[in-house]
């Protein structure tokens, strides 16, 4: 966007200095096209968002015909509003006291040559309280040694472009204005009254305007009904976001016509009844988001048809039955999110053959007995976080040839015996953390040839000797944190060593880590992250010989390490961060000879050394550009 900065500064100066000329329009260039921007003040209690004819203020008067034209299509505007406009224009002695009482800003953008209005925005509640808002203070500053009425000096050095001005007021200008964004949740302080939109009395649209409007964002305001849209031409609207408001009823949505609407977002409201969606006139709707409401009953949508719907988000509601899916039509539904509801029976969705992502987290169905009945040939991701599941036996008969992610964390699974019979040839991510699993040997028989990530942390695993039988040769992430593991010698000859990038063994009972430096160990050629913190390690003397040449971060905090002489010999070219917090290190002098040219951070908090006795080592590291962190994360906060 090319903008004439001098014109903007001159304009703002004139607009906010009540003692100067009444001309309140200036020219700008927007996307290589010329426009005219007009801002003015008047006194009333309405917010209007219209596209009525542009009116310009020249000199001290405004022709009556212009006024009439300006309001010819606006409904419910009191006569005193028109009088306020004329009074403002004709006034030659507007004082700061009157200025502080003004509570409306008009912002009007029009094409320079044709005079056609691109948009017009009315902002209410500009009063003395508003003037104390941080955003307003950024614009004006009282001149030194001057009277109170001279709040006209611009002090915000960042207010150099129209984009900045727009962002401050939550506006979005894009060429011929096909998008309107009135999000309250912007960079302004959330206590600001500037962009609070409530009922239709405060948000009025002019009929038959914005014919090219295809995106409307009104999220995070105080809208409580959909009647505010009744005067808006929705013929070309493709995207409508009303999330984060106070909408409890969507009854009027069936009166609206959305022939081209593709995405409707009604999340974070107070909607309970969705029956009116059954008759919504949105024939090509593809994405419907009803998450974070108070919906309980979906059966009212029985026999409804959603021929083009691809994404349906019902998460974080109080839904206890999804029977309506049996009789409703979702021929191409790909994404279904039922996260955090009260559904016990998932069988009604088994026929949704086009599903690619299914999220069933935190529902109390406890068993996956519906899986063998599922016609999910296209399914790529399925999530069962915290569903009280006790067995994985039903997975052996599930036919998911394209499954990539299987997530079963935070359940009550103890045995995974039947996983030896499971065949998911494209599976890349398996999450079984937060269960009660002790024996992982069945995984050595599972047919997961494409597996890249395996998460087994927070279980009761003690023995990992079966890892060398795992056929996951492509594995890049293995997490075994928070188990009961003490022996890790199996890593001498595990088949996935070469490709592994992250190995997490934190919070176990490991004492001996010599396996990493044993000459017979298969190289961890691509390993970048090695987590060994919160164990019982006291000796790292041979760590410099470890086959981890590409290592970037080593976590050794919360162990029993005393000597760190190994760092004199260590020469890992990519190593950038070492965590040695909470050990019993008393001497830092070996760090003086450190050769790790890419090392950026070394964590040394809560050790036994005395800082004054180790200043030379600390200063040497600092001179090499290595940050020595002597406080824990908690202390830093």
Show where each model-derived region lies:
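A structural signal for beta-rich interaction modules in eukaryotic proteins
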Residues: 7-125
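Acidic, low-complexity intrinsically disordered segments
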Residues: 112-146
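LRR N-terminal entry segment and analogous cap-like coil->beta motifs
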Residues: 152-228, 232-234, 238, 246
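Conserved hydrophobic beta-strand positions in leucine-rich repeat
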Residues: 180-182, 214-218, 235-242, 262-266, ...
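A structural signal for leucine-rich repeat
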Residues: 202-209, 227-234, 251-258, 275-282, ...
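Leucine-rich solenoid repeat scaffolds
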Residues: 586-637
């Amino acid at each position: 966007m090319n903008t004439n900065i001098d014109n903007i500064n001159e304009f703002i100066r004139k607009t906010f200095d009540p003692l100067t000329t009444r001309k309140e329009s200036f020219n700008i260039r927007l996307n290589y096209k010329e426009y005219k921007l007009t801002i003015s003040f008047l006194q009333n209690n309405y917010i209007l968002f219209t596209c009525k004819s542009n009116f310009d203020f020249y000199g001290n008067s405004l022709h009556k015909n212009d006024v009439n034209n300006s309001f010819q299509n606006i409904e419910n505007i009191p006569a005193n509003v028109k009088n306020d406009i004329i009074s403002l224009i004709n006034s030659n002695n507007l004082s700061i006291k009157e200025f502080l009482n003004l509570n409306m800003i008009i912002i009007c953008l029009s094409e320079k040559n044709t005079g056609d209005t691109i948009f017009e925005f009315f902002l209410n509640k500009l009063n003395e309280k508003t003037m104390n808002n941080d955003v307003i203070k950024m614009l004006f500053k009282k001149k030194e040694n001057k009277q109170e009425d001279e709040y006209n000096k611009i002090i915000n050095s960042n207010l150099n472009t129209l984009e900045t001005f727009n962002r401050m007021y939550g506006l979005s200008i894009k060429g011929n204005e096909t998008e309107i964004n009135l999000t309250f949740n912007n960079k302004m302080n959330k206590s600001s009254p500037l962009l609070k939109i409530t009922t239709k009395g405060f948000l009025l649209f002019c009929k038959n305007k914005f014919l090219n409007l295809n995106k409307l964002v009104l999220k995070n305001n105080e809208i409580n009904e959909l009647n505010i849209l009744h005067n808006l031409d929705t013929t070309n609207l493709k995207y409508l976001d009303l999330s984060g408001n106070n909408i409890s009823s969507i009854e009027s949505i069936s009166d609206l016509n959305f022939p081209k609407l593709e995405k409707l977002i009604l999340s974070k409201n107070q909607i309970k009844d969705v029956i009116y969606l059954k008759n919504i006139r949105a024939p090509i709707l593809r994405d419907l988001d009803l998450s974070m409401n108070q919906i309980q009953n979906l059966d009212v949508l029985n026999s409804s048809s959603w021929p083009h719907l691809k994404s349906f988000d019902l998460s974080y509601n109080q839904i206890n039955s999804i029977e309506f899916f049996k009789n409703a039509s979702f021929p191409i539904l790909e994404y279904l999110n039922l996260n955090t509801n009260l559904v016990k029976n998932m069988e009604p969705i088994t026929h949704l053959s086009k599903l690619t992502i299914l999220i069933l987290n935190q529902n109390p169905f406890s068993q996956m007995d519906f899986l063998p009945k599922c016609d999910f040939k296209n399914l790529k991701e399925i999530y069962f976080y915290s569903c009280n599941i006790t067995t994985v036996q039903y997975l052996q008969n599930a036919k998911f040839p394209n499954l990539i992610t299987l997530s079963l964390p935070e359940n009550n699974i103890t045995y995974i015996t039947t996983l030896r019979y499971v065949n998911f040839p494209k599976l890349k991510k398996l999450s079984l953390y937060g269960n009660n699993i002790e024996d992982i040997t069945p995984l050595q028989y599972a047919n997961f040839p494409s597996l890249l990530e395996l998460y087994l942390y927070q279980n009761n695993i003690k023995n990992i000797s079966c890892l060398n039988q795992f056929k996951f040769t492509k594995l890049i992430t293995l997490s075994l944190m928070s188990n009961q593991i003490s022996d890790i010698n199996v890593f001498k000859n595990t088949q996935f060593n070469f490709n592994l990038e992250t190995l997490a063994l934190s919070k176990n009972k490991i004492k001996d880590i010599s396996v990493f430096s044993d000459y017979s160990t298969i190289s961890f050629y691509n390993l970048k992250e090695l987590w060994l913190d919160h164990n019982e390690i006291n000796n790292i003397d041979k760590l410099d010989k470890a086959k981890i040449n590409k290592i970037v971060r080593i976590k050794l905090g919360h162990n029993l390490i005393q000597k760190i002489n190994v760092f004199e010999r260590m020469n890992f070219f990519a190593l950038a961060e070492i965590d040695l917090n909470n050990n019993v290190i008393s001497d830092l002098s070996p760090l003086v000879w450190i050769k790790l040219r890419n090392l950026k951070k070394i964590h040394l908090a809560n050790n036994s050394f005395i800082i004054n006795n180790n200043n030379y080592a600390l200063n040497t590291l600092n001179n090499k550009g290595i940050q020595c962190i002597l406080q824990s994360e908690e202390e830093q906060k």
